[in-house]
UniProtKB/Swiss-Prot annotation:
InterPro entries found in the cross-reference section: CPI-17, CPI-17_sf
Post-translational modification (record): Phosphorylated on several residues.
Gene that produces this protein: Ppp1r14d
Family the UniProt entry places it in: Belongs to the PP1 inhibitor family.
Key words of the record: Cytoplasm, Phosphoprotein, Protein phosphatase inhibitor
Protein name: Protein phosphatase 1 regulatory subunit 14D
Ranges for region Interaction with protein phosphatase 1: 21-25
Function of the protein: Inhibitor of PPP1CA. Has inhibitory activity only when phosphorylated, creating a molecular switch for regulating the phosphorylation status of PPP1CA substrates and smooth muscle contraction.
Basic and acidic residues bias spans: 18-28, 38-48
Keyword Signal (UniProt): no
Amino acid sequence: MLSSSPASCTSPSPGTDNPDKKVHWASEKRRRASSTDSESKTHLDISKLPRSRRPSRLTVKYDRGHLQRWLEMEQWVDAQVQELFQGQEESSEPEIDLEALMDLSTEDQRTQLEAILQDCPGNREPFISELLSQLKRLRRLSRPSK
């Protein structure tokens, strides 16, 4: 049975030879060490972690592969537009907003692209057809909620 006397409830002193009290102090030290360990883990140097362990705010919200496909698509569009407008000033190259195109139907997308590329000196039809087929395969990036 447990004793209700206050003498048995006092904290152990490190100077006595009671083995029970030494075990108690050892577990107390372990408990203290683990609390300081967890505090130090919150202040880790992120640059020293392996890449796979580094926190990435962007990929928390979006899938890395999905973002990579969007990036590749945008780079492809930029390269194609530069090729179509080759020999003209860079300021005359139009901006194509893929997000805005995703909101439109396929026919409206084609109409919008033809309007954007109306000043294009090159043949724009193969580019428009390829872009429309790639847009069908591309999923929309969800907009962050406020």
